[in-house]
Amino acid sequence: MFADGKNQESTSESVNGWYAIYLWGLARGDARVRDLGRLMTSLEIRAAWSYWQMTNGESNFPAPFSNNKAVGIQWSTKVDYATWFGGNVEFIHCIQVPKQIQVQKVTLSMNPLQLSSDAPIHPDI
């Protein structure tokens, strides 16, 4: 356990995990599993929009996070503008992109590369 509690760095794994459960339920004809997967996928996507990808004027976090339009790692007690493997801008924004499947088109309502180029990056975060 870390001093700042549990953490999550990338939304792509959780979205894809729940989407896989939806597909599994669909393939097996199990409506309960399918519906659970669909619900949890939509909740994860909403969380990604609310807590990882920020649009102008919409943020759960103060500047400089809102200025950068992204959060790298969310902890139980804090947020970081970094990843486990580095603090490069492209790492922080593009960690949300890795597994490009159909559901990711919905999750990435904003282009992380465009957000990065629009954001006044603060390296001291």
Q: PLM ranges: what are they?
A:
Residues 2-10:
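Catalytic cores of eukaryotic secretory-pathway lumenal/extracellular enzymes that build
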